[in-house]
A protein has these predicted regions:
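Mature, function-bearing regions of proteins
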Residues: 1-275
Length: 275
C-alpha cells in the first residue's frame, strides 16, 4: 500500500500534520526548537524531510543507509525541554512517537481525500508496512505495538499524557510569522517571488494552517489544543472531494513525486492506484 501512497501528492499534503503531531511531544518539540534549521531554512528543511521519507519506501538498499544516517544525525541531539526535563532524540519513547504519527495521519488523510476509508484489512496491511518502515529507521518490533488493535491504546495514551501545544507547534500553525520565499528556481523567478512575497505569504500561511490542522486526526487536534470550527470542517470536506476527484486522473508525472515516480517506473509499477 505504501508503494502507491507514500509518494503521491496526497501524502505530501498530509505530511505537515504528522510533523506537527511529532513536535507536540515536548521532547521532540524541544529538540526541533533547539537544533533544527526550520526557521532559517524552512524550504530546505522541508525538501530534505520529503526526500528522506521517500527513501524509506522507494529507496531499496538506500533505505537502510538512510535509516542509519538519521540515527547518526539524531544521536547527539539532547537537552532540556520547556518543563526542565532532560530529553534525547533517540530515547525510545521519543523516536517511536515520531515514527508512529504516520499511521493515524495516513488513515485520516484517506478518510478526507481518498475514494473511501481504508477497510480493516487495508488498515492492518498499512500498519504492517509501517512497522517495516520502522525497522528501516532502527525501531525494533518489540518497541512498537504489533497490530492496529494494539496501536490505538498506545496512541490514545500519548495523546492524553504527553502532547501539548509547544512553541514549535504554535509556529507551524501561525498565520502571522515570517517565512522567507523559496530560494529555488531560475533567477527571474526568485526575483519575482521576492517582489510578490508580501502579498503571497499571508494566504499561503492560512492554507498551511488549514491543511496542517485539518489533515490531523481530530483526536490529536483536540489533544494539542488546536482550534477547528464547523466552518473549517465544511471547507475541509469540500477540499477533500475536489482532491479525490482530481488526483486519481492526474498523469503519473504530476501525481507522484519524482523519486517515487522513478522507482515505480523501474519496478514496472507505474500504473495508477485508484485510491
Amino acid at each position: 500500500m505504501l508503494w502507491s501512497l507514500a509518494g503521491e501528492v496526497r501524502a505530501v499534503l498530509a505530511l505537515p500534520a504528522a510533523l506537527t503531531m511529532q513536535v507536540a511531544h515536548p521532547a521532540v518539540g524541544a529538540g526541533v526548537d533547539d537544533h533544527s534549521v526550520f526557521r532559517t531554512d524552512p524550504w530546505g528543511r522541508a525538501e530534505r524531510s520529503v526526500a528522506s521519507t521517500q527513501l524509506w519506501v522507494y529507496g531499496g538498499e538506500a533505505a537502510a543507509e538512510e535509516g542509519r544516517r538519521l540515527r547518526k544525525l539524531h544521536e547527539p541531539i539532547r537537552g532540556t525541554d520547556a518543563h526542565g526535563r532532560a530529553y534525547r532524540a533517540l530515547a525510545l519513547a521519543t523516536y517511536t512517537w515520531v515514527h508512529a504519527t504516520g499511521f493515524p495521519v495516513y488513515r485520516h488523510a484517506q478518510h478526507v481525500m481518498g475514494r473511501r476509508p481504508f477497510t480493516p484489512a487495508e488498515e492492518r496491511q498499512l500498519y504492517a508496512e509501517w512497522l517495516r518502515v520502522g525497522r528501516v529507521l532502527g525501531i525494533d518490533d518489540r518497541d512498537m505495538p504489533q497490530t492496529p488493535e494494539e496501536f490505538w491504546p498506545y496512541y490514545r495514551g500519548v495523546l492524553a499524557r504527553e502532547l501539548e501545544r509547544t512553541v514549535v507547534v504554535r509556529e507551524l500553525v501561525a498565520t502571522d510569522v515570517y517565512v522567507p520565499p523559496p530560494p529555488r528556481g531560475p533567477r527571474w523567478l526568485r526575483t519575482l517571488l521576492r517582489w510578490a512575497w508580501p502579498a503571497l505569504l499571508p494566504p499561503l500561511l492560512r492554507v498551511r494552517r488549514f491543511l496542517t490542522v485539518g489533515l490531523m486526526p481530530p483526536d490529536a487536534r483536540r489533544a494539542i489544543g488546536l482550534e477547528w470550527s464547523a466552518s473549517d470542517e465544511r471547507r475541509l470536506r469540500w477540499f477533500g472531494r475536489v482532491v479525490r476527484v482530481v488526483v486519481p486522473v492526474l498523469p503519473e508525472r504530476l501525481r507522484y513525486l519524482p523519486y517515487a515516480r522513478d522507482a515505480r517506473r523501474r519496478a514496472g509499477n507505474g500504473r495508477r492506484a485508484g485510491a
